[in-house]
Amino acid sequence: QYYGCNAVPGGGLYVLSDPFGENPQLRNLLENSVVEKGRLKGRKLDSGTFLSPELSFDGKTILFAYTQAKAWAKYQGKTAYEWSPEYSYHIFRCNADGTGLVQLTDGSWNDFDPCFLPNGRIAFISERRGGYLRCGRHCPVYTLHSMADDGSDIIRLSHHETHEWHPSVANDGMLVYTRWDYIDRDTNIAHHMWSCFPDGRDPRSYHGNYPQRRESRPW
């Protein structure tokens, strides 16, 4: 479960130069960068946690998720988890050299796993649709969304009731992702690959939709 409240501060966005040579070099891409747009404008991203970097098709732009990873009091005396922007993941964009750093999403929910779409939009995973897991009522659900490349026009692509992860674009232009689907089946075996059109239409499972029972698997 990719919740910013579970993240430990540390790390960064790095590039490994000459990775297969005799002297590979690791470089902090954002070492001299400050956020140019968004709630964290004017600040460096040097004290939080990074997740799911994504390179554009032309190799010029990078998307990633970042949380400030501030301290969080579990449950806060309530029956459901409630986040604040300071310990939620948000999506950022920068140029391949680390310049042009801007914040695209914000709010009291986690946004992560950004993915460039061929039509210029960005697919990502978000808790914005609302709802909680059936087997963990206090845990917010995150599913497929998309937005314009400047963070505007956010659209929900999936209404599924449990988590989805890792969107990517297949060679035929379809959006491929994983989904936790345990309706009428065991809880922990159905994290399989699904596909849909980039606008969310026609979600389908590649594997069929009736996996074996957990007890019948060799592990």
Annotated model-derived regions:
Residues 1-43, 68-87, 92-96:
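Beta-propeller domains
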Residues 46-55, 61, 109-122, 161-176, ...:
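Conserved beta-propeller blade repeats
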Residues 16, 65, 94, 123-125, ...:
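Residue-level marker for isolated small/hydroxyl-bearing positions within beta-strands
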